[in-house]
């Protein structure tokens, strides 16, 4: 599990591991590109650096899909969301629009694009809205992801609020806030 340290908190990025688990379970033999950058690269950069280096230079500015699975006859875009479901619903159609403009994916330009939003549990409003966007909602998660999902509601208990207040006071005392 990737842990990102900032001045005030330790954040866990669980979605990349979860997507890897999902692909291993459901698409074990498929070609997969994790955190695949999408979209065009500016012509100015291609002229200045050449196409390969321009792609590397511009990568931080390009959006990334959690996973792109190359299936026989289709491309599958997978975006996983533990909590921010609206972000996943909104991003997937944009990502699909960027695939034909992505130089690294031009060979797949004519393939149909499927979009899967991976959720830990069924969320009724997401399932209701997804078909209008061409998104299929998939609910699959290992136990450790379900635990994270269940723990999210506990962050607003009196006990959790008290722990946050104590932590904030300590950070302030140490000069971080």
Label each residue range with its predicted role:
Residues 1-177:
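Charged, terminal alpha-helix-loop-beta segments
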């Amino acid at each position: 599990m990737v842990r990102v340290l900032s001045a005030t908190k330790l954040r866990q990025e669980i979605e990349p591991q979860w997507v890897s688990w999902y692909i291993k379970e459901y698409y074990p033999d498929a070609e997969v590109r994790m955190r695949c950058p999408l979209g065009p690269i500016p012509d100015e950069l291609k002229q200045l650096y050449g196409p390969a280096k321009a792609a590397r230079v511009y990568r931080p500015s390009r959006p990334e899909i959690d996973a792109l699975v190359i299936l026989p006859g289709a491309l599958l875009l997978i975006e996983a969301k533990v909590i921010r479901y609206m972000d996943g619903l909104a991003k997937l159609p944009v990502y699909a629009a960027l695939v034909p403009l992505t130089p690294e994916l031009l060979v797949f330009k004519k393939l149909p694009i499927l979009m899967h939003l991976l959720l830990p549990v069924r969320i009724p409003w997401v399932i209701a809205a997804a078909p209008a966007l061409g998104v299929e909602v998939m609910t699959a998660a290992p136990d450790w992801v379900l635990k994270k999902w269940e723990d999210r509601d506990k962050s607003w208990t009196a006990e959790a609020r008290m722990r946050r207040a104590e932590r904030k006071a300590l950070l302030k005392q140490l000069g971080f806030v």
